[in-house]
């Protein structure tokens, strides 16, 4: 059965992660999210307090990114950022893995890094960003298996910051690996309704995009990385 606009909207994390995002742009992001009933807005952690105020009593969650976009910070730093973002009003956390550790064969360190943030989140859902454009298929599977074992809420394809975005093949691989219990978030390059529906068909359950309004309106999306 085709998805209605309302159902499609509830798969969307309406996203603005640009380093120069102004307060006015964050307010507009939140206004759009409330109007279209998106699942959440996804913002940098410094913008969580403003977004939380703007979305109070709307039912739209605030999602904060952690260790973004490189994932190369200390685990303790990522955990602190997650804790602080949640205290400021974030209802979901998207973290970037330690990609360098994975490439160096330090899988235990990668898993410990994810676990540290997962513990800091408590009951708040954690999404783990793989940055699939930098990984081999074997590495993608390895991280998805870690996330499945740790019981995080979602695995997520990409940051959308210059290393390639979501692909149907990656979404399908991630879904096969984590099975039916974890969410899969496709992010990076999902800019129109056809792309959104294709990602959902491939196994995604959430979409990270700056083109949410265009997607639910069936228009051409914007040109940002998200």
UniProtKB/Swiss-Prot annotation:
<dbReference type="InterPro" id="IPR013785">
    <property type="entry name" value="Aldolase_TIM"/>
</dbReference>
<comment type="similarity">
    <text>Belongs to the DeoC/FbaB aldolase family. DeoC type 1 subfamily.</text>
</comment>
<dbReference type="GO" id="GO:0004139">
    <property type="term" value="F:deoxyribose-phosphate aldolase activity"/>
</dbReference>
<dbReference type="GO" id="GO:0016052">
    <property type="term" value="P:carbohydrate catabolic process"/>
</dbReference>
<keyword id="KW-0704">Schiff base</keyword>
<feature type="active site" description="Proton donor/acceptor">
    <location>
        <position position="94"/>
    </location>
</feature>
<keyword id="KW-0456">Lyase</keyword>
<dbReference type="InterPro" id="IPR028581">
    <property type="entry name" value="DeoC_typeI"/>
</dbReference>
<dbReference type="Pfam" id="PF01791">
    <property type="entry name" value="DeoC"/>
</dbReference>
<keyword id="KW-0963">Cytoplasm</keyword>
<dbReference type="GO" id="GO:0006018">
    <property type="term" value="P:2-deoxyribose 1-phosphate catabolic process"/>
</dbReference>
<dbReference type="InterPro" id="IPR002915">
    <property type="entry name" value="DeoC/FbaB/LacD_aldolase"/>
</dbReference>
<dbReference type="GO" id="GO:0009264">
    <property type="term" value="P:deoxyribonucleotide catabolic process"/>
</dbReference>
<feature type="active site" description="Proton donor/acceptor">
    <location>
        <position position="185"/>
    </location>
</feature>
<dbReference type="InterPro" id="IPR011343">
    <property type="entry name" value="DeoC"/>
</dbReference>
<protein>
    <recommendedName>
        <fullName>Deoxyribose-phosphate aldolase</fullName>
        <ecNumber>4.1.2.4</ecNumber>
    </recommendedName>
</protein>
<feature type="active site" description="Schiff-base intermediate with acetaldehyde">
    <location>
        <position position="156"/>
    </location>
</feature>
<dbReference type="GO" id="GO:0005737">
    <property type="term" value="C:cytoplasm"/>
</dbReference>
<comment type="pathway">
    <text>Carbohydrate degradation; 2-deoxy-D-ribose 1-phosphate degradation; D-glyceraldehyde 3-phosphate and acetaldehyde from 2-deoxy-alpha-D-ribose 1-phosphate: step 2/2.</text>
</comment>
<comment type="function">
    <text>Catalyzes a reversible aldol reaction between acetaldehyde and D-glyceraldehyde 3-phosphate to generate 2-deoxy-D-ribose 5-phosphate.</text>
</comment>
């Amino acid at each position: 059965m085709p998805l209605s606009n309302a159902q499609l909207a509830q798969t969307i994390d309406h996203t603005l992660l640009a380093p120069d995002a102004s307060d006015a742009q964050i307010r507009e992001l939140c206004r759009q999210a409330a109007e279209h009933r998106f699942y959440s807005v996804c913002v940098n952690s410094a913008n969580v307090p403003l977004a939380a105020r703007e979305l109070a009593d709307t039912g739209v969650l605030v999602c904060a990114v952690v260790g973004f976009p490189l994932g190369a910070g200390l685990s303790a730093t990522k955990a602190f950022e997650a804790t602080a973002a949640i205290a400021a009003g974030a209802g979901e956390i998207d973290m970037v893995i330690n990609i360098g550790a994975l490439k160096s064969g330090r899988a235990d360190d990668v898993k410990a890094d994810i676990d540290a943030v997962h513990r800091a989140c408590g009951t708040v859902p954690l999404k783990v960003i793989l940055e699939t454009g930098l990984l081999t298929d074997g590495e993608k599977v390895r991280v998805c298996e870690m996330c499945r074992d740790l019981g995080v809420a979602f695995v997520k394809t990409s940051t959308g910051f210059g290393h390639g975005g979501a692909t149907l093949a990656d979404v399908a691989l991630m879904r096969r690996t984590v099975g039916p219990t974890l969410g899969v978030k496709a992010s990076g390059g999902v800019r129109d309704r056809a792309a959104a529906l294709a990602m959902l068909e491939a196994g995604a359950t959430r979409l990270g995009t700056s083109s949410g309004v265009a997607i639910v309106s069936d228009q051409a999306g914007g040109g940002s990385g998200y």
